[in-house]
């Protein structure tokens, strides 16, 4: 399938069983041991239509010095393994994000790339993180920025879910979610490596993105410690009314919830706030009036 394919999407409907796996990061763990542990965690999830892992669970979200050394390509054995996991689980599998290089790009280019596999194990979508965290250091200094929002149609026997992909720091930028909501997104999946020190932002912003776009939000965070940064955990699944369907604490955990898109459609019909967007104004540049006097 062409990952860049553009076509009209069917409306979201039905019910989707989701599992978000909150992973504990251990910087002393060998990469092969971490991969094996992830396999055990996902195998223990049980039946689900969509399984989600956190951002950079393989590399470490704050392990900047090892990113380049441990970067992988989409042809890596890691992705072959993840494809097999999706096929074995017969589930959509958002395998989190990875430091990815591409043969056709400049040698210095590396992206924080999320990957989504379908139940047959086929790679159905990738998303390069658009907003890089770290200001003048961290991600802006080390990796390239993505520039393409990504929406994918998840199909199961019971549901169709128009799903937007984003990553961690993207959560702070509501314009991304409003932009993809115009494509009909009813679910936003957000893997992260969010620190404990700003965990109240993580929780509040997730609910805000759900409320303002009347969409489900699945936030899958890391826990543990990475380069002396205490990771926040508190993964959560939120409905389109801002109500929390499931929430973790700081322990490694699997969150589960059933997303009812028929109920979401009823919410959107009974309170059609999205119909009142003024895209004509926001698309026009130079129209803001600066008032110098009352």
Curated annotation (Swiss-Prot):
EC class (word): hydrolase
Keyword Hydrolase appears in the UniProt entry: yes
Family, per entry: Belongs to the carbon-nitrogen hydrolase superfamily. NIT1/NIT2 family.
Pathway given in the UniProt record: Alkaloid degradation; nicotine degradation
Any Gene Ontology biological process: nicotine catabolic process
EC numbers: 3.5.1.111
Gene3D superfamilies, per database record: Carbon-nitrogen hydrolase
Catalytic activity reported: 2-oxoglutaramate + H2O = 2-oxoglutarate + NH4(+)
Molecular function terms, GO-annotated: 2-oxoglutaramate amidase activity
Taxonomic source organism: Paenarthrobacter nicotinovorans
Keyword tags: Hydrolase, Plasmid
Protein name (Swiss-Prot/TrEMBL): 2-oxoglutaramate amidase
Role summary: Catalyzes the conversion of 2-oxoglutaramate to 2-oxoglutarate. Together with glutamate dehydrogenase, may form a physiologically relevant enzyme couple, leading to transformation of metabolically inert 2-oxoglutaramate derived from trihydroxypyridine into glutamate, a central compound of nitrogen metabolism.
Entry-linked Pfam families: CN_hydrolase
Top-level taxon in the UniProt lineage: Bacteria
Catalytic-site annotation from UniProt: 55 (proton acceptor), 129 (proton donor), 168 (nucleophile)
Keyword Hydrolase: yes
Domain CN hydrolase: 16-261
């Amino acid at each position: 399938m062409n990952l860049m394919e553009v076509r009209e999407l069917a409306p979201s409907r039905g019910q989707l069983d989701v599992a978000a796996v909150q992973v504990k990061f251990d910087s002393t763990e060998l990469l092969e041991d971490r991969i094996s542990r992830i396999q055990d965690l996902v195998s223990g999830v049980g039946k689900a239509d969509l399984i989600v892992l956190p951002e950079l669970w393989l590399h470490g979200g704050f392990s900047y010095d090892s990113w380049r050394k441990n970067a992988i390509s989409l042809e890596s054995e890691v992705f072959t393994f993840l494809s097999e996991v999706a096929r074995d689980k017969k589930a959509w599998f958002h395998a989190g994000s990875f430091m990815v290089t591409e043969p056709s790009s400049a040698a210095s280019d590396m992206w924080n790339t999320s990957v989504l596999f379908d139940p047959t194990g086929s790679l159905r979508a990738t998303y390069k993180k658009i907003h890089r965290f770290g200001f003048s250091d961290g991600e802006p200094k080390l990796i390239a920025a993505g520039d393409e929002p990504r929406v994918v149609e998840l199909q199961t026997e019971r549901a169709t879910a128009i799903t937007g992909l984003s990553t961690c720091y993207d959560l702070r930028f509501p314009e991304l979610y409003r932009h993809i909501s115009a494509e009909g997104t009813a679910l936003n999946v957000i893997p992260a490596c969010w620190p404990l020190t700003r965990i109240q932002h993580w929780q509040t912003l997730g609910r805000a993105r759900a409320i303002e776009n009347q969409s489900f939000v699945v936030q899958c965070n890391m826990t543990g410690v990475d380069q002396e940064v205490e990771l926040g955990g508190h993964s959560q699944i939120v409905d389109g009314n801002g109500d929390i369907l499931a929430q973790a604490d700081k322990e490694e955990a699997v969150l589960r919830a059933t997303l009812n898109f028929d109920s979401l459609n009823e919410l959107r019909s009974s309170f059609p706030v999205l119909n009142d967007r003024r895209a004509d104004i926001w698309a026009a540049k130079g129209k803001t009036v600066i008032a110098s006097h009352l």
